[in-house]
Amino acid sequence: MASGNCTTPTTFILSGLTDNPRLQMPLFMVFLVIYTTTLLTNLGLIALIGMDLHLQTPMYIFLQNLSFTDAAYSTVITPKMLATFLEERRTISYVGCILQYFSFVLLTTSEWLLLAVMAYDRYVAICKPLLYPSIMTKAVCWRLVKGLYSLAFLNSLVHTSGLLKLSFCSSNVVNHFFCDNRPLFQISSSSTTLNELLVIISGSLFVMSSIITILISYVFIILTVVMIRSKDGKYKAFSTCTSHLMAVSLFHGTVIFMYLRSVKLFSLDTDKIASLFYTVVIPMLNPLIYSWRNKEVKDALRRLTATSVWLH
């Protein structure tokens, strides 16, 4: 885009995580292992849920979509970050930057909404167990999934449209390892007031609606579990929620820290670390969190292993 005598650059330069040449190769190896682990665990969980009939339940349909989102999320960010460790000139095309930002917002919003839907699913399962099969049918599950992806797409479209209106005349150096809004706002030569307002409003709307849904769901879950007399019943009810609560705490805690702060508290160096955590580390942790101590997933893995051994 052009504005007066200003022409938007065809490429941006990403500063990456560090300029220290001694750290480039060690960091490349660390994040390559993390990315490989992320893909293997998330795609493995997607395949396991798809192949095992015992896991064809609403809870695992949502978990399958969460794993897809995490795998896609990591793929949008990590490969380019890995390239910055090896390249002397860390460039990304203008179109590539816009597409990365669009995908990033789409997947972030999808994860917010998925975590909220998963909390509602746990609420229905624990608080209304007799009605659960009729309320959370497969058709309802897939409608919820399609709906949340549609909302995420619209949110991403609005943010990306706002970004396309900005001009970048003075600098094309993005002080980050991917194309995020705040670093791009920093180098914009046009006003970003509306863009920043949109980030706050949209972020507050989606994050707060997700958090409120999760909080209300868990208030009712706790009240229901407290009334269960048997210790085994209480343990079983809580055990289905602990992994979700861990995932929610990690993801929402980091995102709130990142995006719902005032501009005065904004620090690019601090945000690089926070961004690294929720774009690279959390997608690796989620499948481990949901699989760890999950008897149904372990049983499904045993069945798959036994079938493979029998076939051979």
From Swiss-Prot:
Cytoplasmic face of the membrane: 50-57, 121-139, 227-239, 293-312
A Pfam family annotated for this UniProt entry: 7tm_4
TM region(s), chain numbering: 27-49, 58-79, 101-120, 140-164, 206-226, 240-260, 272-292
Disulfide bonds: C97-C179
Carbohydrate-modified residues: N5
GO CC annotation: plasma membrane
UniProt-listed PROSITE patterns: G_PROTEIN_RECEP_F1_1, G_PROTEIN_RECEP_F1_2
Entry keyword set: Cell membrane, Disulfide bond, G-protein coupled receptor, Glycoprotein, Membrane, Olfaction, Receptor, Sensory transduction, Transducer, Transmembrane, Transmembrane helix
Subcellular location: Cell membrane
Extracellular side: 1-26, 80-100, 165-205, 261-271
Domain of life: Eukaryota
Principal localisation: membrane
GO molecular function per UniProt: G protein-coupled receptor activity; odorant binding; olfactory receptor activity
Coiled-coil residue windows: none
Record InterPro entries: GPCR_Rhodpsn, GPCR_Rhodpsn_7TM, Olfact_rcpt
Membrane topology: Multi-pass membrane protein
Annotated PANTHER family: OLFACTORY RECEPTOR
Family: Belongs to the G-protein coupled receptor 1 family.
Function summary: Odorant receptor.
Official protein name in the record: Olfactory receptor-like protein COR2
